[in-house]
């Protein structure tokens, strides 16, 4: 480590109102300061929620760490030594961190620290905030000094805090999930500089978005997965849908809550009317195919043939070579522009050649919505936060723009321990 870095201290969890002068005034009590900076967003000029303090005497860093917790401008701040080991790699197994979901809007970091001290020594508390609305987004993270404390608190799963039920899950970084993350971002420290919203911490049992591409976008249909299975990942924006339909969790209950590859938007269903953990099941498959209502006969006869394969305003797929629906054996183009041979007459149990397997009651390809583990909340986290609050017209949890925790001003506290100045 360079000599001028030995006395540098990273300070995270700063209030939006904390200035460089306030930060320097607070830490000067621990020793002479030779440099102090609050990191700001280049575009908006607003604080990013973290900064750096450099002491003339490096021993003052330990003095600060031994005299916590520290509170500045009404927030519990998080000072850490600024060195490569602490800033680049978290402890294996998640750093004894837990996720807290469904937090009351009036709970503070001090309240959480006081409450969870009964389970063991708390080393860090972070509540996610919406910078625009200046209020809690209803979830956060808490770190313990001992792993046994994490096991103890997660065994309860739910606790009652300020009259509201709060969910507790063990949090682990995505880089410990077998390298399945398709985003080219790295986890840096407890709150590293990331390419996605917040950090790559999520519940240890939740899978990575099955259809996630670069930068959190949907990357295409997963391999070896039947297309058109009902109740699968409802609410996600597909290929050809409008941004208004993009959701993270349960979608609208009407047809068209997600679209297929290149399919035009269907009719929009009613807005969600639920909170907590329940969501309506859906019976449509990808691309607007109504698999439960499909018949087992051969080629559909026109747009309404069979009443099934094209029920949600998709272009007819059943035209033969001459353009006449059901005009006998020939070829047609499916939703992927692949030529298909249509069979005439006689029952068919699989639909058109190259088509989707039949689903419905009694078929193994059909599952209920509750059997799927929805990996919501953008691509940074592996769980669905939209179930913690009642939505009103928008479904992304917290109603704030998606951003990288520590790289944008839309979340609180957006600081990144992997960036040294």
Curated annotation (Swiss-Prot):
Single GO MF descriptor:
mRNA 5'-UTR binding
Task: Read off the InterPro entries from this record.
Answer: DAZAP1_RRM2, Nucleotide-bd_a/b_plait_sf, RBD_domain_sf, RRM_dom
- Family annotation (SMART domains): RRM
What Gene3D superfamilies does its record include?
3.30.70.330
Matches recorded under PROSITE patterns: RRM
Spell out the GO cellular component terms annotated for this protein, sorted alphabetically and separated by semicolons.
cytoplasm; nucleoplasm; nucleus; P granule; protein-containing complex; ribonucleoprotein complex
Quick check: keyword Protein biosynthesis in the entry?
no
The biased composition feature labelled Polar residues covers 240-250, 275-284, 406-421
Quaternary structure annotation from Swiss-Prot or TrEMBL: Interacts with sqd; the interaction is RNA-dependent and may be specific for sqd isoform A/sqdA. Interacts with otu; the interaction is RNA-independent.
PANTHER family for this protein:
RNA-BINDING PROTEIN MUSASHI HOMOLOG RBP6, RRM DOMAIN-CONTAINING PROTEIN
Q: What is this protein called?
A: Heterogeneous nuclear ribonucleoprotein 27C
């Amino acid at each position: 480590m360079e000599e001028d870095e030995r006395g540098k201290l990273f300070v995270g969890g700063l209030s939006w109102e904390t200035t460089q002068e306030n930060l320097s005034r607070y830490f000067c009590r621990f020793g002479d300061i030779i440099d102090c900076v609050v990191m700001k967003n280049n575009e908006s000029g607003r604080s990013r929620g973290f900064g750096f303090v450099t002491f003339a005497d490096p021993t003052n860093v330990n003095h600060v760490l031994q005299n916590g917790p520290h509170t500045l401008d009404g927030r519990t701040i998080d000072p850490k030594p600024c060195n490569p080991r602490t800033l680049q790699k978290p402890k294996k197994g998640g750093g004894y961190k837990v996720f807290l979901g469904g937090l009351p809007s009036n709970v503070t970091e001090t309240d959480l620290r006081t409450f969870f001290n009964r389970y063991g020594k708390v080393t860090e508390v972070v509540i996610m905030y919406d910078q625009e609305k200046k209020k809690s987004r209803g979830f956060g993270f808490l770190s313990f000094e001992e792993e046994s404390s994490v096991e103890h608190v997660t065994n309860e799963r739910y606790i009652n805090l300020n009259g509201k039920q709060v969910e507790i899950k063990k949090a682990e970084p995505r880089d410990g999930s077998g390298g399945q993350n398709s985003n080219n971002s790295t986890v840096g420290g407890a709150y590293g500089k990331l390419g996605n919203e917040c950090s790559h911490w999520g519940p240890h049992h939740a899978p990575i978005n099955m259809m996630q591409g670069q930068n959190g976008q949907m990357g295409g249909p997963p391999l070896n997965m039947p297309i058109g299975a009902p109740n699968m990942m409802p609410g996600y924006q597909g290929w050809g849908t409008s941004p208004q339909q993009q959701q993270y969790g349960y979608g609208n209950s009407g047809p068209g809550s997600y679209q297929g590859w290149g399919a035009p938007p269907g009719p929009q269903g009613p807005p969600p009317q639920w909170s907590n953990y329940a969501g309506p099941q859906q019976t449509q498959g990808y691309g607007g195919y109504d698999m439960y209502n499909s018949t087992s006969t051969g080629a559909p006869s026109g747009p309404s043939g069979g009443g099934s394969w094209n029920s949600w305003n998709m272009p007819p797929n059943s035209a033969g070579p001459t353009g006449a629906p059901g005009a006998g054996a020939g070829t047609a183009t499916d939703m992927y522009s692949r030529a298909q041979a249509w069979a005439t007459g006689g029952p068919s149990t699989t639909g058109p050649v190259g088509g989707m397997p039949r689903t419905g009651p009694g078929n193994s390809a059909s599952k209920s919505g509750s059997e799927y583990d929805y990996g919501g909340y953008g691509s940074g986290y592996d769980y669905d936060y939209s179930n913690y609050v009642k939505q009103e017209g928008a479904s992304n949890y917290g109603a704030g723009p998606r951003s990288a925790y520590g790289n944008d001003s839309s979340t609180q506290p957006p600081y990144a321990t992997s960036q040294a100045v």
